[in-house]
Structure formats: structure tokens, C-alpha cells
Amino acid sequence: MSEPHRVQFTSVPGSLNPAFLKKSRKEEVGGTEQHQDCEPAAAAVRITLTLFEPDHKRCPEFFYPELVKNIRGKVKGLHPGDKKKDVLDPFNDEEKERHKVEALARKFEEKYGGKKRRKDRIQDLIDMGYGYDESDSFIDNSEAYDELVPASLTTKYGGFYINSGTLQFRQASESEDDFIKEKKKKSPKKRKLKEGGEKIKKKKKDDTYDKEKKSKKSKFSKAGFTALNASKEKKKKKYSGSLSVREMLKKFQKEKEAQKKREEEHKPVAVSSIEAQGLRELEGTSDPLLSLFGSTSDNDLLQAATAMDSLTDLDLEQLLSESPEGSPFRDMDDGSDSLGVGLDQEFRQPSSFPEGLPIPLEKRVKELAQAARAAEGESKQKFFTQDINGILLDIEVQTRELTSQIRSGVFAYLASFLPCSKDALVKRARKLHLYEQGGRLKEPLQKLKDAIGRAMPEQVAKYQDECQAHTQAKVAKMLEEEKDKEQRERICSDEEEDEEKGGRRIMGPRKKFQWNDEIRELLCQVVKIKLESRDLERNSKAQAWEDCVKAFLDAEVKPLWPKGWMQARTLFKESRRGHGHLTSLLAKKKVIAPSKIKMKESSVKLDKKVSVPSGQHGGPTTLLSEHQGGGLNTGANSREHPSQATCGLTDSVSVTLEDSLDEDLVRNPASSVDAVSKELATLNSRAANSSEFTLPTPSKAPTEKVGGVLCTEEKRNFAKPSSSAPPPTNALQSPLNFLAEQALALGQSSQEKKPEGSGFKELSCQGPLSKGVPELHPSKAKHHNLPRTSHGPQAAAPVPGPQVKVFHAGTQQQKSFTPPSPFVNKLQGPKATSPQCHRSLLQLVKTAAKGQAFHATMPASSGSSPASSSSAHKTTASNSTTISHPAKLHPTSSVGPSYKNNPFAGSVSKHGASSSSPSPGGGAQVQSSVSGASLPGVQSPSAGQSASRAAPSSAVKKTPVTQKLTLVAPPGGPNGDSGGGTQGVAKLLTSSLKPAAVSSVTSSTSLPKGTGGAVLLSNTSSLSLLSSSYKSNNPKLPGAMNSNSLGIITQFPLHVLSFNADSSAKAGVSKDAIVTGPAPGTFHHGLSHSLLAGLHSSPPHTAPLPHAAVSTHVPQSLPDASQLHGKGPVVPRKL
């Protein structure tokens, strides 16, 4: 099988690869005949190397493959057959490739090979544009220097550069012959192609035509300006002299005509003989350029080469049209026709001496012109000596006072003498002036720097002292904050903490430089000098002036101060006296808008004073309900608004504590109060149309006052919260404040607190409601009077001042619990049954029976102040569940039955269920918290409806009696006390009372069918907790009820605040209600939303019980607050 493979490999004719042969022989023969077979193919090669002593220039180098090739080449040369075979060898690709390249190189050398370098022909240089269309604007050969440089010269650094200025030349050395060949190869090639065909002829003449064209342009179209290369042209007048240019041109003309005839007569094949003849003709003479300038010495040659680039912009035929006469150094005033003089005449015609110059300026211009003539032929660097620069600077300064036209004429005139163009001369003069002005600035800047150096040490030392003091104060403050941290957490809600942090943020001492008159004066002086040195002509806009001053101050003046001590804007402001006349043209007064944080702080302060609710999460619901609370007497509206409130609540539940959901109320406190007043007025007008009751017009001023006083007083009353309590939030406080404000507007005159028992305080406020001025108990003079004018529907009937008793049940507070959105939805669901509410009430009664020494907390709200307040003010006993302690409650004020044999007897009237079901946001909300997990906002109409309608009549017939409300709230206010809870409950009472009927009877009768707007709307009527009159003189309430079902919740103490409210202004029924509400900070999400939403969604009815009221005491660890509602109320626990 191996044989066919070998045949395939060796089938190519020619000698086989030695390696391949070796391998095959090894395999077959075993290597015995290997040497004989391989000898012919791989003959031994002897190489002789001659070594020499290496030095720094060279050392012996040998390339073995090359040596072997050379020797084998000789051998192959002896055997042409072998060579042939070697080329055909398929494995010798390198050799084949080399042969191909050599053949290709020979071919190109024959075709394009460089001929002997010929001398430049004068015709090529003078008439380069011959035959081109001079009207063609596309061709531009103005920079084709390479066509003009003599063969014996080269550029200084080799090569040609477009638009890089004047070229400098040097003699070409023999060692650079290759470079010159490469560079000069174009000329003969172009010449040959030109003679050979039209196409290349045009390419060759590209360069020269545009030179002529550009020179004509500069001469004729720009008559008012000198050529940019005017200086170069002047240099050539030195070298004009020995040769008659006219004779040369005649000779060139004859040559051209003869050449044309030859081209027409002879075929292109004859081109080479014609060219050879022309070359022989020209070779006999010296370099035409040398003959043109009349000298062949190297020195003159270099000078001529230096002047050659000026030919770029000249029309040589015109410039050389007159034969030169005289010495190349003759004076300019000589009117001869030298090359330079002709040039000067051509280009100096437009720039005549300007007239009307001041005598000093005219004198300086003539001096400069005379100096230019004396130094004629000098380069720019040599010409502009110190004296010339001084004269030019003087001319620049004087021409600044003249018009721009005269100034331009002066420089145009000077440019005709000087070795530079007008633009270059103007730039040089401006630079000299700026440099001189910069020298003027050095001294004032140094003075300013010295003054700053004298002032800085003292200020730096002062700054360091301030930094040290600041550091010490910061450390002290940190220590103090650590000590007060727990107390501050209890006192401040989240929002207040954020605001205080923002307000208290203490920045370190600033590096503020203290200016003195000396430094300010030096700064203004520096700025004035800088402005004087600025070009007034080109920078006349005020904005440009301002930018210039700012850039100067930032770049040159600001660094004079140590880093961080000065800012450019401060420098600009302090130096306004120096630049104001230029920079103030476009200056605008900047109106600095107050920062949002400051606005928020001020509005919060205003809120504290005016008692406008600013709860974090109650805001949107409150606003929604306020604006929508107008016409809610129809069942459709009442259903509509609870859903809207529900949406607002669910949306806001997930909001973080830092978000103020009541921002509108915070920013527009007056508008929110106005909205409430308008709403109450609307309710009043609607109620006036009904036969059952009339609502008096509310007054909003007292609400604001009393709210503010109440806030401050409650803060004082509960000044000492337990340190273990978590920091409360404002979320509850704001809506409660709003509600309490309304409740207090009903006529509570004053509040006072005194410590009682184990940490209990009694706040008793007595005062006739009609007067609105509180009477203080002598023993409680430390508290503020709470002036109250009658506010809302209850203000109609004066009622004796009630006593308000506040009990601190304990110091523990539960953390705020935000009910989840699904739970809120459950609370707002429309399908709660009244039996559930009754069941919850019964459970509440049972737990109350088990309670120890506290009054019954409101069953409807397991700690929800709004429910009880609403029940007390707006519901009669018939339509509310009355829970009374037999020893301490009068049943007289309660229309419904009261159970006296139980510590907490709840009279749950069917009217309540019926009334709540028709009410869009009334008593239903109170029981919703009691009703348990479902807590529907929509009440199904039941038999209780008829009872609720019947109850109002009986209630209306009763005589007006004082109404007492007992609010139970856990500790925790803005200051860590339970004042926030009291205030919140009071506000809740009022808010629920304002829109609702004055008496519970009236509210129940007037309640239209609908769903409660609050989250915790219930089917049952609002609960009048302890509706039978409660003895105000009895300071103690029944002990905390331990609810088995709510064991987790019962551990949190509640404060009990009892105060009377004139709720039965029209019905004339006095009621005592105990409202249990959590501390304002314990829950900030659900309560405020549900309260406000329910409150405003059903204005004419009892206040909605917020879902938050139920969930306030539920720890956040609980999975769902809805589990707790049906199990019993949260009651105060005796410590």
C-alpha cells in the first residue's frame, strides 16, 4: 500500500527533495545506499569567510542562507540544466518568487527607469501654466513650490509642506542624491508625459496656472491690500541685474513655438528624439536660475533659492517683462525697472500714505518706513529689533485713538515697507501692546498679593480656632444626643425628626475672607488696568466684558489667595466698582427662591400654631374628603366617596414615613380650614332643608386658636414619656389634631392636667360653652386656657363646662403599625353584617367586665379615638352602643338602654346598625373597628334603620344636657407625652361632629343610605361610648380590660382623656363618651387616612372610624391586623 503513495509524491519531474529521498531509502533499503543517492542532490559546500577587526562603524556580518545560495548559484550557473530543474522544483517556491520579482523590477525599470538627472529648464519655471484655461477656478497651484526649486537646491529639512509658511533652502549634497532623484523625478516625467499626450499635459500644468491666477487675483481683485508675500518679493531686487529678462523671454517664446510645430508635425514616436535634442541644447548652458540672477557662486545661489518661494504669488511674465538695470542694492527711490522695484510699484500702489494723521503719529510712521528701507533684505527676526518694536508699539497706541479706517490705512502703508503682511503687522502690534499692558499689571498684582499675605495669617488662625471649637462642640453634641436619644425619639415624630435633622445640620466653619479697604482698592485697580488693556474695538459687548473680567479674575487674581479662601464670583462682586460701568449693562437681579426645606419648616411651624392637620398620611384623604364632602346626602354619593377615600388610603399606606401626605395642608393651612368651613356651611344649608335638624354655621377662627393652644398644652401635660417607647410619628397627630380641633370648637373651654394615682394625670376643663372663654381650676393654673367659641352644629346650645380627666395608663408605647393594603381593602369592603358588629360589641362588653379599674374603652375602636368621638357627638343612645359603668355613669343622657349591672354595659341599639348603614361615613365607621376583620364600609339596611329613624324624634325632645367625652389614648405626642393622642382624639371628635348631626338622634335620622368613607366603616351605628352621662368628678375609670383574644395588644397602655363636648346642641341630649385612641405616633398610616376619608365622605353623619384605630395597638410583627378586630377592643392596662 505504501508504493502508490511514493509514486504519487515523486511523480513531479525534476530532482526530488533530499529529505524525501532519505526517508524512502531508509524505509526500503535501511540506509545502506543512502549516501550515494543523496550526494548529487546535497553536495557539500565549502564557505570561506574573511574576518576583519570590528570597530564602532562596522563588524563582520554573514548570512548563512545567502552564502549557500551564492555558492550554489555559481554551481548552477555551470550546469544550466540543473538550474532549470531547480526553478521547476515544486518545493522551491522561494526561488521562483524571487525570479518573478526580478523580472517585474526589470520591466518597470525599462518602462519608468530614472534617466540621467537633467538641469532645470527655464521654460519649465517661467511658463508653467502654459496651455491651461486661466478662467478655471478649480485649479490652485499656489503652493507648488517643488516646481520652482532649482535642482541644485533642496529644502532645509527635505520635502515640501503646504500652508506652512516660507520655505528655507540649502544646497543639495551628493550624499542625498537618492533623495533628490526621488524628489526631482517628477519634472522629467511630467515633461515626457506632456509631450506624449494631452492628459498628462494638463496635470503637469496644474501647478503653474494657478500661481499666475492667484498672483493676478492678489494684484487686481485685492487692490486695497498688499500680498502676503510682499516681503519675499522685495528681497529679489538685490539679485536682479546681469541678465536681460526680455531676451530670455524671447528665447523661451521661440522655443515654445518651435516645440508646438514639432508636436504638430511629428508623431508621438518622435518625442524621445525631440526631448533629447532639447536636453542637449539646454545642457550646454548653466542652470537657468543661476543665469537669471546673474551669479553662480554658492552664496548667491542660496540667496536666490531663499527668494524663489516668492515666485509663488507672482506673474513672472509681467514681473520679468522689463530688463533690470543697475546694482541689486540700489535704493528703493530709484525709479528703475528692477525686479524688486517693479514688484514694489505693483503692490504699493493701493497703500498710499494716509492723510489727516496727528503729527506725532505721522512722525513715527515715517521713522518706521525709513528704518525699513535701511534694513531692507533683512529677515523678520533681524528686522524687528527693540527699536523697531518700540516705534511699532508707539504707533499702535496712538492709532487706537483713531478710527478703524485710518488705523487700517496706517498699517497697510507700513506693511508695504516691512517684511510682513498687514495682518501680521497688526497682530504683532497688538501683542506688543498686550505685553506692555501685562507689564503694567505686574506691579498692582504684586501689591495685591502682598496685602493678601499680610491679612491671611490672622484669618487663618481665626479659622483654625473656629474649626477646633466646632469640633469640640460637635463631640459634645454627639454625647448629648446619645443621652437624649431615647427621649428625643419619643418626643419627635418621624417628620419632625427629619425636619430637625435638616434644620440642625451644622456645617463646619467656612473659609470666608474678611475684606479690608486696602485689598478691595487694589483689586479694583487691577481690574481697571486690565480693562484698559482690552481691545475696545473688538470687544464692545457688555456680556463679553463680563466674561473677560470673570476669566481674568479666575485665572490671575484668584490664585493670589490660598486655596479655598476665595471664589471668582466674590472677586467679581467686590471689584464691581472697577468694572461696573461695562459689565452692569446686562446685569440682572437674581431672585433667590427660598429653599423647599425652609418653606416646609416654616409651614410646619405655622401648622403648629394654627393647628391645621399636617399628618403625614392623612393629607390626601383629608383633602379628598374635604373637597368631595359637599353633597353627600344622596346614597350614590355616599357610596362613591368612601371608595375614593379607600383608594386614597390604600395608595398612601405604602408611603414611607418621610413622605408628607399632607403637604397641601402644610403649605396651605388656611385653605384647608376654609374648605372645612365651606363644607360645614353646605351641610348646614342642606340640614336646614330637612325637618329633623338644623346645623348652625361654623366659625373657623376659634378652631385655629383652640387647636394651637391644645397642641401646646397637651405637649406640656405629657412631658415625660417612658424612655423605652419607640419614636412616634406625626402621621396620627395631624389628622387627630384636625379632628380634635373641630371637637374643641364645639365648646370645650379649657384643659388641665394633674398627676393622679400611679402616673395618672387629670385634665379638667370647665367653662361655659356659650362664652367660649375657659375657666381654670385654681389647682390647675399651670395649664393654658383653651378659648372656645361655639363651632360647628353643636354650638347652638350652651352647656355647662365639662371636666376632662386624663389617665396615663402606662409608659409603654407600641410602634407604629401600618396596615397592609389588602387589609385596608378588607376594612373598606362593602359586605359587613351588623351581627358582626354586635358580636364585637358583646365581646368588648365581656372583656370590659373582666377589666380592673378603668372606664370602658370604646368598644367600637380598640383604641380608636375617632370612633368614640364621633359616637359621642353625633349619635344618640338609640343609634349608638352605650357602654356605661353602673357606678360612674348617668343613664340620663343616653337615649338608648344602658346596662348598669356590668362594668361595661353596652347598649347596642339596632338603630346604630340602621343608622350606620344609611350613613356614608357616619356611625358605621365607629362600629367598623369593633366589627372585626370584615369591617365593611357599606351597611346593609336592616330593621335597625326604622329604629334609627324613630330614635331621633325621641332624642330631639330631650332637654339639652352636658355631654362628656372620655378619650383614651396611649402615651406619645410630639414631645413624647400623650398630648398628641389627646389632641388627635379631640380633633377627631370635632371633625366627625362638624359634618354630622348635632345629636346622635339627628345624625341617625338624617343619615342617608350609603357606605362609610373611612376604612373602618361598619354596618352598625356609631357607638356612643358611655353615652349615659359620666360623672366628671369621679377621677377613675374601670381598670384595663384584659382581652383574651387580644393578649398581644392589651400590654400596650392607653391614656384616658375625658372631657365634655357640646355635642347635643340641637338634640339637647348630654352624653358621656369614653374614646380609646392610640398615641398619635403609634400608627400614622391607616388612622389618618381612614379618619379623614370617612369624615369627609359622609359629612352629615357620625365620624368614620379609621381602620388605623383598630390596628394602632397591633404590633408590626402581626401578619394581618384584620385578625384582631373581631376579637375585642384594646383596653388600657393597669401597671
Swiss-Prot record:
Biased composition (Basic and acidic residues): 25-38, 79-96, 194-213, 253-268, 480-493
Modified residues (N6-acetyllysine): K222
Keyword annotations: Acetylation, Cell junction, Chromatin regulator, Coiled coil, DNA-binding, Nucleus, Phosphoprotein, Tight junction
Keyword field contains Nucleus: yes
UniProt modified residues of type Phosphothreonine: T166
Post-translational modification Phosphoserine, affected residues: S173, S175, S323, S336, S338, S493, S660, S677, S1028
Keyword flag Chaperone: no
Pfam families recorded: HUN, UBN_AB
Biased composition (Low complexity): 792-804, 856-882, 905-934
Cellular localisation: Nucleus, Nucleoplasm; Nucleus, PML body; Cell junction, Tight junction
Family: Belongs to the ubinuclein family.
Subunit and interaction comment: Component of a complex that includes at least ASF1A, CABIN1, HIRA, histone H3.3 and UBN1. Interacts with HIRA (via WD repeat domain); the interaction is direct. Interacts with ASF1A, CEBPA, TJP1, TJP2 and TJP3.
Job of this protein: Acts as a novel regulator of senescence. Involved in the formation of senescence-associated heterochromatin foci (SAHF), which represses expression of proliferation-promoting genes. Binds to proliferation-promoting genes. May be required for replication-independent chromatin assembly.
The protein's name in its UniProt record: Ubinuclein-1
Organism: Mus musculus (Mouse)
